[in-house]
């Protein structure tokens, strides 16, 4: 995506994980200059820095205080630690965490906010950010305008959301993405015991997602618990006798489905 705002910023990335691997190249392609990539692991910093033509640093004292924007693409635990060690007050400081309030910056930065891309990222699979929803927040109007401009270099879907509401969004995302993926992992494990390839479920998964998108999750819900088919439910619970934790999960989820 081209840089529609007509201004090029010097940007430093703090963190070189999955989120940084998507945001940094996209911002570079939009015309911004990625100055530095910091990671406590030098190999991680160098790998991303090479991709975006930046300097790699792995010591917090080597992070230059001259960038316009600092993007903290870190885990929640790492964010607090890094902020206490990289003591740069100038510039605009932006974290990308769904569950962290922007007030984490309050005592140590003057201008700050959040850009939260609602997507699951891995380095191995590049995501087209243009249709990924980005949720932004800032501590003042000037910072919000700048964060909005930066976000629009990456996505067409920008929303303003408070820290409290972003926590709810993050929680919902865990249910929709992480927990569903856990179910896929267990399904793969069960199939593997019988030498059945997981890809036999691909069509089912795709159709389920398509129906959810078209008619909504409640209307798309099917299966024995939805039908009240207790014979099948008892059969499944019996099959899970060697996995008591999953037997409990199956029972609990089935009871929740019955209440829908």
How does the language model describe each region?
Residues 44, 48-51, 111, 126-168, ...:
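Internal alpha-helical scaffold of NAD(P)-dependent oxidoreductase catalytic cores
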Residues 1-57, 127:
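NAD(P)+-binding Rossmann beta1-loop-alpha1 motif at the extreme N-terminus of oxidoreductases
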Residues 42-46, 50-126:
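Rossmann-like NAD(P)(H) cofactor-binding subdomain of soluble oxidoreductases
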Residues 38, 71, 173-176, 180, ...:
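Amphipathic, non-transmembrane alpha-helical scaffold segments
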């Amino acid at each position: 995506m081209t840089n529609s705002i007509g201004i090029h910023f010097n940007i430093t990335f703090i963190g070189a994980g999955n989120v940084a691997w998507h945001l940094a190249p996209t911002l570079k392609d939009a015309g911004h200059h990625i100055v530095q990539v910091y990671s406590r692991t030098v190999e991680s910093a160098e790998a991303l820095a090479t991709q975006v033509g930046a300097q790699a640093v792995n010591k917090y004292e080597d992070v230059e205080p001259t960038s316009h924007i600092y993007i903290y693409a870190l885990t929640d635990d790492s964010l607090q630690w890094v902020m206490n060690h990289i003591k740069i007050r100038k510039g605009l400081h932006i974290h990308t965490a769904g569950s962290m309030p922007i007030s984490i910056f309050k005592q140590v930065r003057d201008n700050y906010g959040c850009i939260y891309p609602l997507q699951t990222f891995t380095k191995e699979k590049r995501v087209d950010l243009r249709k990924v929803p980005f949720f932004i927040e800032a501590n003042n109007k000037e910072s919000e305008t700048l964060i909005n401009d930066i976000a629009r270099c990456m996505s067409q879907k920008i929303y303003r959301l408070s820290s409290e509401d972003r926590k709810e969004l993050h929680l919902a995302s865990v249910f929709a993405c992480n927990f569903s993926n856990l179910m896929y992992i267990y399904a793969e494990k069960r199939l593997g015991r019988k030498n059945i390839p997981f890809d036999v479920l691909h069509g089912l998964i795709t159709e389920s997602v398509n129906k959810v998108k078209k008619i909504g999750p409640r209307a798309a819900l099917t299966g024995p618990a939805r039908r009240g088919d207790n014979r099948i439910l008892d059969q499944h619970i019996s099959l899970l006798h060697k996995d008591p934790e999953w037997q409990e999960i199956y029972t609990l989820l089935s009871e929740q489905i019955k209440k829908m």
